[in-house]
Amino acid sequence: MFLPLKPFVYFDPKDWLGSQLSEPGLEAKMDAAWSQTTGSKRSETMQETMQDIFDGEMLQNFKGPDGKHFGHKEDEGHYVFLLSIDFFNPLLNKQAGKMVSVGIISLVCLNFPPDIHYKPEHMCLVGIIPGPRETLLMIINHYLTPLVDDFLDFWHPGVQFSQTDGYKHGRVVRCAIVCVVCDLPAARKTSGFRPSSHSHFCAICHCTRQIQGYNDTDYHLWRRRTKEECLASAKAFYEAESKSEQGMAYASSGIQWSELLRLPYFDQTCFVMPCTIYSLVSSINISKIY
């Protein structure tokens, strides 16, 4: 009999979503969120100022497994999620206290009305990453594996719920993780990018410390990374037959494998973003949103 060195507490997002879909009136509001996307009456008269993620270009053009827009279909529920991973000291951050770090993996359904996105009763606590130290990049993949497995089922063929609030005879539901929001170190770990101290310090473009450095602000000359390039670099790292090959693949791109790349729609170049509050607290001024 084997005992785990570190037990990982995981909560099934399918069970959680089933409970949310049973709440009176909530399912209809979740379906209505797609009214802001391409082809809808709202999108034709939309103002330039965006009010919700559904106003953004990515979800306006996001396609499902059938190659068509992922928006609401009458016979299926199509929902998108924000993934967050954060580490904290459960013993509180005291000046003379112990340095302990425990992580949480959580989901927010972006189809919920914005005013309830972050209410505890409407957030999904997926897992608790055990301490006592913050998890390394390659180890965090093991904690993401069951979540990715569940969302592969959600993507195709979808998950059949026997009954929901609006569909007494059941309904197929498809879901996708379209946004990863963490502080900068956790965002890079989760998506497979190395820390900003690496030679390839940028997750958006191909700038390096040796050539452009940190002071080059002529962004018109920066070459943006593409989804295909990042995926090829991550696969080269994953399929390497030795540590030396992995080191070469990593050194040339600054990218390692992330479990999220098993999701066929996941795009490292636009799905991952540092949490806004950390940027503001760190006095980081953003002059252009990419």
Q: Which residues does each predicted region cover?
A:
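Domain-level detector for long, ordered catalytic/regulatory cores in large eukaryotic signaling
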Residues: M1-Q51, D55, L152, H156-Y290
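Short interface patches used for recognition in eukaryotic signaling and trafficking proteins
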Residues: K6, L125-M138, A187
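A short, flexible low-complexity segment enriched in Lys/Arg and Gly/Pro that occurs
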Residues: G56-G71, D149, V180
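Short coil/turn segments at secondary-structure boundaries
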Residues: K94-M99, P120-H122, M138-H142, T190-G192, ...
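Intrinsic disorder
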Residues: D75, Y79, P130, E134-T145, ...
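Acidic, metal-ligating active-site segments
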Residues: N61, G67, K73-R133
